[in-house]
From Swiss-Prot:
Induction: Transcriptionally regulated by IscS. This is NAD-dependent dihydropyrimidine dehydrogenase subunit PreA. It is an enzyme of class 1 (oxidoreductase). Binds 2 [4Fe-4S] clusters. One of its GO terms (molecular function) is metal ion binding. InterPro entries: 4Fe4S_Fe-S-bd, 4Fe4S_Fe_S_CS, Aldolase_TIM, Dihydroorotate_DH_cat. It comes from Escherichia coli (strain K12). It comes from the Bacteria. Signal peptide: none annotated. PROSITE patterns: 4FE4S_FER_1 (PS00198), 4FE4S_FER_2 (PS51379). Heterotetramer of 2 PreA and 2 PreT subunits. Belongs to the dihydropyrimidine dehydrogenase family.
């Protein structure tokens, strides 16, 4: 049971909660989107539609693992919806008729101004609440579409204007992360009439190489291709782009729908605290199913209550004041590790990592199989705490560097 109301108004549209399917295979037809709504998702971004009919490869997925974990990163070679345009429009109409209180976002992609304008008109007539312009799919076979467009501020601005000519609906521009400065493109979208930003789409990648056949994965008749990477591994990239946009003077109040590695309520809270107001998910659903929204909503609701927030909007962007340029960070002190020997299992990983990858400050007793920090050598990097498998190494004593004035420190 939710302890707090998770509704939020985004670009003038009220969402029952911030959790949405992102434009992808998880929202490819009426049946899938209906199940998502029934499970508790607040909105759906229907898989990108256009006049272009995708001819897909098989297989089309790959994944990246770390030791014995589930996959941490996911590669896909899918393009836009493979169904005919009329079939997709019919699905949009039916979804809005059957779920009038849920938010339906139509993702569109054209190859020229005329197509963008016409698609905008068609999805508004079909009942969509919002439009998301996909300027960022990294594996389109047409260079007039996808991330090639999203890297050009001029094209993004031009196509946003075309969409605004075709529709009066709120419109998001979906950003590609395959670019150095996302703010430049976001500003172009704003000039073109976009009401907000969706970020990020997938990262261009090669995930694995088959070492026997010397071919990238997945293998399609002896070949492979660069394509989009998603999942938990891209979350830091997404958070960085969102933070940079929300702290840009001309984008500070520009609404953002956050995408990239969200699969827990903690992930959701991080995106919200950096300035996203709605949240889109694909890879987490592909791995765990639509049901993950139940835990995400419950956890986020309890977090709001614990933190004393009355509404979701109150927490949006709060963390940005605490992210500063590297040159502004306090470099006057060292934090030494504190080792809880009651929890220590004597594995020695802290010692090995510090010796081979740090500053040889962690000493090791073969007799007791316990570590000890030599503060004469320790620089306070806390690598030891990050590699500890049982969490027995914590932040400990704060020591100010020679010549520095002592002052309160927040850890």
């Amino acid at each position: 049971m939710l302890t707090k109301d998770l509704s939020i108004t985004f670009c003038g549209v009220k969402f029952p909660n911030p959790f949405c399917l992102s434009s992808s295979p998880v929202g490819n037809c009426y049946e899938m989107c209906a199940k998502a709504y029934d499970t508790g998702w607040g909105g759906v971004v229907f898989k990108t539609i256009g006049f272009f009919i995708a001819n897909e490869v098989s297989p089309r997925f790959d994944h990246l693992v770390k030791e014995d974990t589930g996959f941490i990163g996911f590669k896909n070679m899918e393009q836009i919806a493979e169904h005919p345009l009329e079939e997709n429009l019919a699905a949009l109409r039916r979804l809005k008729e059957d779920y009038p209180d849920k938010v339906l976002i139509a993702s569109i992609m054209g190859e020229n101004e005329q197509q963008w304008e016409e698609l905008a008109r068609l999805v508004q007539e079909a009942g969509a609440d919002m439009i998301e312009c996909n300027f960022s799919c990294p594996q389109m076979t047409s260079h007039a579409m996808g991330s090639d467009v999203g890297q050009s501020p001029e094209l993004v601005e031009k196509y946003c204007r075309a969409v605004k000519r075709g529709s009066t609906l709120p419109m998001l521009a979906k950003m590609t992360p395959n670019i150095g400065d996302m703010c430049e493109v976001a500003l172009a979208a704003k000039r073109g009439g976009a009401d907000g930003i969706a970020a990020i789409n997938t990262v261009k990648s090669i995930t694995n190489i088959d070492l026997n056949q010397k071919i990238g994965m997945p293998i399609v008749n002896g070949k492979s291709s660069i394509s989009g990477y998603s999942g938990k591994a891209v979350k830091p990239i997404a958070l960085r782009f969102i933070q940079q946009m929300r702290t840009h003077p001309e984008l500070r109040d520009f609404p953002i729908s956050g995408i990239g590695g969200i699969e827990t309520w903690e992930d959701a809270a991080e995106f919200l605290l950096l300035g996203a107001a709605t949240l889109q998910v694909t890879t987490g659903i592909m791995q765990y199913g639509y049901r993950i929204v139940e835990d995400m909503a419950s956890g986020l609701s309890h977090y709001l209550a614990d933190q004393g927030f009355d509404s979701l909007q109150e927490m949006v962007g709060l963390a940005n004041n605490n992210i500063v340029p590297a040159e502004d960070l306090d470099r006057s002190y060292i934090v030494y590790p504190r080792i809880n020997l009651d929890k220590c299992v004597g594995c020695g990983r802290c010692y090995i990592s510090c010796y081979d990858g740090g500053h040889q400050a962690m000493e090791w007793s073969e007799k007791t199989r316990t570590p000890h920090c030599n503060t004469e050598k320790c620089v306070g990097c806390l690598l030891c705490g990050h590699v500890c498998p049982v969490g027995c190494i914590e932040l400990g004593e704060v020591k100010f560097k020679k010549g520095e004035k002592e002052h309160p420190v927040t850890l």
